[in-house]
C-alpha cells in the first residue's frame, strides 16, 4: 500500500485521461498509477472541462489514481485551499448536495477530498482510517460542523477525507463501461470503503454490513477509473451537475466503487492494482469525467438509461465477491483503508454487478448528479470550496457513513451502503428507476437521522467513526426494515448470503435513496454512508422493505433498475441476466447456491403453495412458516447487524455459515430480495461467500433489525431491481396476502423478509411449533449466533425436512393411518362407544328441553302475572280500572291455563333431570300432559284476534297504551314489544316437535323412554298440525275479509267453511266487445266482479260451483277462451294466454269436483256417478243460463238464415243463446233459471219447452200456456207479412255449419281473389276435402263451398318478413290468395289445404 501510495502521490497529470474507460478491467482492475500532483489540480482541470460530458471511457490506470500518496499533507493543503470554498461547498455539499439529488454525496465527500483527491492516496487512507476512528465523533462534528469547522475537520482527517473525496471523484468520473464502473467501485471503496472499514474494525458488526454493501459497490470494475473522476468530482460534489443516466449510473457505480475503492485502494492496492492506481484512476477519472463534468448540471431527476443486463450480471457477481471481501475487511479491523480498499475493491470488481445493483438504486437518486458535481469540482474546484468541501464532504461522508452505517446497516443489505452517501446518492440517482419506490422511504428515514451530518460536509473522520460506531450500535431494525436491500443481498449471495448481498445492494439503493433524501439534508451523510461498512447495516433494513413491500413495484421503471445494473457493464449482473425465478425466486436462488437441497426446497415450496391454495393452511401453520422464514430472513438480513456486535469472528463465522446457508437456501427473505439476490446467488459462487459474511452480520442485523422492525425504518422500502423481477414474485402476492398482510403491522421490513422467507420455506413450519416459529423469527434476529444457527437449521430443515405439501400430505396420511391403523374396531366396543355417545346426547337434549321450558315459563309469567300486575298497579294509581277485565282477559286469552300447564311440566322435568342417573326418561311427562297441549290450538286460533284487540285498545284507551308502553320499556320486558311475548306460545309447539324428534333419534330402541317418546311426539305433531291448520284458517279468514272489504256495498263473503283459492283478471266476451272482469274463486263459488275506478269491485254475480261446467272452445281460433256455464250465468272468458287459460280451467274444474264430492257425502245413498248422471238428466232446457253467442260471430239468423241488417236485428234465445231474427224469436216462455220469468225463446226451444212441459205434470200457471200481455199484438204483427224476401240458400251450403266440431281445419283468414282485389276477413272450414266459406264463425250456412281436389297450394315468400301469404292454384292459375295472422298458422293452413287436394 505504501508503494502504491507513493506511486499515486506524484500527480502526473491534473486531468488523467480516461483511457480505456470502456474497457472492463478484471475484477481487480490493474490500472497504471499515473502521477498526479494534488487532487486539486485535477479538479481545476475538471472545472475547465464542460459541465456535461459524454460517457468518457476512463482507463483503469487513470482510475487507479492514488489518493493515498499524500495521506494527510495534501488533504491538509486541500482543506486549506478549500477552506475559503468550504463554506460555500459546505452549504452546497451539506444541504445542497444532500438535498440536491444531482450533487453526489460522494462528491461532497470528495469536496472535502478535493484536496484529498489532489493529495496522494495515503491521505485517503488516513481519511478512511480517520473515518473508522472518528465515527463517533462524526455526529459531534456534524452538529458542530461549520465552514471553518469543516475546513479544520477536513484538515484533521485530511487523508481519510481526501481519500473519500478522491473516491467520490472517482465515482463521479466512472463511465458506463465496466472499467469506469470498476474504477468507480475502487474509488468508492477507497473513500467509503476505507472509512467504513475503519469503522468496521472498530465495530465488526457495522463493518460487516457496510463491507457487504460497499463490496457490492466496489463490485464495479470501473472503480479505479471512477476514483479518478471521483477525486475530481469531490470539489464539485456540492455542485449538482447532472450526468446522463448512463454516466450517472456509471458514476454511481464509480462513486460507490470509488468511495469504497478509495478506502480500499489504500488497503487493497497491494492486492489489486486497482487500489494502487486508485489515486491515478481518480485523477484520470477526473479527466475522464471531463465529459461527465460536461454533464455536470443542476440535478435533474433522470432515470438511468437501461444498460445491457450483461453488465448487471457481472456487477452482481462482483458484488457477491465484494460482499465476501467486505465481510473480511469488516472482520479484520486491521484492514484499515488499505485492507478495506483492497477487499472492497476486489469485492467491487467481483461484485461490480452487485455494486451496480445497489449503486443503481443509489444512483437513481442522484449519483449521476453527484458525479457531475464531482467532475465540476474537479474541473472548477470552486463550485464547492475545494478544500473545505472535500474535507467537509469527507467528514460528511464519514459522518454519513456512520449514520449511513446506521442507515446502511438498515439499508446496506440491499445496497452497498459502504459507499459514501454521496456515492450512494449518485448511484441512487442513476438507478432510481431500478430501485423500488419503497426504498426511498426507508432511505429517507435512514438519512433523516443523518441529515445534520449530511449538512455538515466538514464533519471530521472521528465524528464519522462515531456514527459508524453508533451505526453499529444503531444497526437499526429500521435498517432491517430496509430489508428490501438486505433481501437483495441475501438473494445475491444465498438465502442468508443472498439476503445479505441483496440487502447490501438494496441498502445501497436505499442509501442512494437515503442519499437523495440526505442529499437534500446534506451530502455529509452520504459521505458517511459512503463507508462500505455502512451499507451492511442497511442490509438489516431490508427486512423492513421486504415486509412492507415484498412485491411493491418500484417507482422507477424496471429498465431503470436494469440500467443501474447495466451501468456496471463491466460486471453483468447475473440476477438481471438470469431468467426470473418462479415466484420462489429467493428460494430458488438459494437452492441454486445449495447444490442439492435447493431444488427440493423449491419444489417443496411450490408444493407448499399449491397445498396452501388447494387445502389452505391453518393460519397458525401459515404463521409458523412465515415466522420461520422470518427467522431466516431476519437472520440473514439481520446477521450483519447482529454480528457486528459480536465482532469480526462472528462475521467470519457468519460468512461460513452464510455460504453453507446459501448453498442451502433457507427462506426467501423478501419478494425482491429473494428474486434478484437469489438469482444472483445462483449465478455466482461468490455470492455464497458474500452471503457468508452477510450471514455473520445478518445475525447481528437480525438483532438490530428485529429492534429496527419496531424502530425507525419500518416504512423503509428498498428501490431494488427486485421490482424489476416482480414476475418472479407473481405467486408472492397470494402468499403475502396470506401471511404478510397480518404481519405487516408488526413485522416491518424484517417481518416482511421473514414472511417472504416463510413463504418460500416449506419446512419452517416443521422446524418449530407454530408459536415458536412465529416468535423465533423475531427473537432470533436478536441474537446473531442464534440467528445464524437458526438459519443453518433452517437451511438444513429446508433440504432435510419435508416440503409443506409433503407435511400436509403426511399429516393427512397420519390422520388416515391413525384411523386405518385402528383397523376394524370391535363391533361390541364400537357399539358401546356409540351407546355412550348417544346417552350423552340424550342427556344434553333433555337438559335443553328443560332449560327451554324454564325460559318459556318465564315468558308466560311475564304475560300472565307481571303484565296483569302492571295494569292493576296503574289502575290503583289512577283510582279506576285502566281497562276492563273482560277485555284484558280476552287479550291474555288462555294464558293462565298455559302458565299452569307449563309450570307443572317444568317442575316435573326438573325433578327428572335431578334423578337422571336413576331414571333416564322424560317423554312420559309429555304423554301425560298431551291432552292439555291442545289448548295451544285454541290460543293460536285466537291469537290474531287478540293481537288486533290489543292494538285497538291501545288506540282507544290512552291510559292503557301508556301502561303497555311503560311495561315494554321496563327491564323485565327487555325493551321488547308485548306482541313479541304473545307470539311465544304460538312458537312453542313447533319447538316441542323439534326437540322430541331429536330426542327420539338419539334414543336407543331398547330404551325405556323410546315408546313414550314416540307417543309424546305423535301428540305434539297432532297439536302442531292442528295449530298449522288453524293458522292457515286465520290467513284464509284475513283474505276473505280483505275481499269483502274490497267489494262495494254490503256483501257477506265470509262464510263458514269457505276457502279462498284463486283470483285474477279475465276478459269477458260481451255481446260486442271484450271487457275486463275480476274473478275470485272459492271452494264453493266463483265471484264475478267489475273493477271500479275507486279500486274497489262491483259484485256482478256469485256463481255457485254446483252444476257449473267449464270447457274450452273447439274452434282453432279461440284457444285462449274459456266457456263457463252455470245456473245463474254463463259466459265466455278470454285469458291473456293459453297457459293462463289452462290454469283457470284446472282450478275451476278441480273446485267443481271437490265441491261435488262434499255434497255427495250428505247423500250416502247416492254415488258420485249416479249423481252426475242425475245431473245430466235433470238439466233440462232452461234450467241453466245459456252462453250467448257474441253478435259479431253470426251474420244471419241461425234458424232461417236471413241476414241481419240495420232494421232486421239480432235477438238471443234465452234458452239456448243462439242469435235469431225477430221472426224466429216471437215466442216467450218461463225459464227455470230465471225463476219462471218469461223470456224470449227461439222457435226450436219453444217447441222443446212445450214438449217438456207436457211430459211433466201440468203446472198451474205454466208459462208455456200463457203469453205475454202483448202476445195478441205481437201475433197480429207476426201475421202481417214482413215484406222481406227470404234468400234461398242451397241445401249443400247448409250441410255444414261454421262451428262444426269435426272439421279438418277452421278459422279466420284474409282472402283475396286477385293481387289487386281487397282482402276480406272470412271464416273458413275444411271438411271432407271441401273448403267452406262463412261470413262469421257461427253462421249455419256457408257463403260458398269449393272442393279442393285438383288444386295446388304454394307459399308466397316475402323477403322483408315472415311469409304469411299462400296461394290456391288451379292448373297453374291463381284461384285465391290467403293470408293468415302468423307464420305458424300459415303453415298449418297450407298443410290442411294440401291434405284436401289429395285423394
Swiss-Prot record:
The answer to whether the entry has keyword RNA-binding is: no
Highest taxon of the lineage: Eukaryota
Principal location: cytoplasm
Q: Where do the DH domain residues begin and end?
A: 841-1030
Q: Which residues bind Zn(2+) 2?
A: 1213, 1216, 1242, 1245
Molecular function via GO: guanyl-nucleotide exchange factor activity; zinc ion binding
**Composition bias type Low complexity, residue spans:** 50-60, 403-418
- List where Polar residues composition bias occurs: 332-341, 377-402, 428-453
The subcellular location is: Cytoplasm; Cytoplasm, Cytoskeleton
Sequence segments annotated as region (Disordered): 1-99, 138-164, 185-210, 235-281, 299-341, 367-479, 515-542, 631-650, 657-678, 768-840
Q: Tell me which stretches of the chain form a coiled coil.
A: none
Mark the FYVE-type zinc finger spans by residue number: 1191-1250
Q: Which residues carry this modification: Phosphoserine?
A: 494, 531, 583, 670, 697, 1167
Disulfide-linked positions: none
PANTHER family associated with the record? FACIOGENITAL DYSPLASIA PROTEIN (PTHR12673), FYVE, RHOGEF AND PH DOMAIN-CONTAINING PROTEIN 6 (PTHR12673:SF12)
This chain's function reads: May activate CDC42, a member of the Ras-like family of Rho- and Rac proteins, by exchanging bound GDP for free GTP. May play a role in regulating the actin cytoskeleton and cell shape.
Record's protein name: FYVE, RhoGEF and PH domain-containing protein 6
Gene label: Fgd6
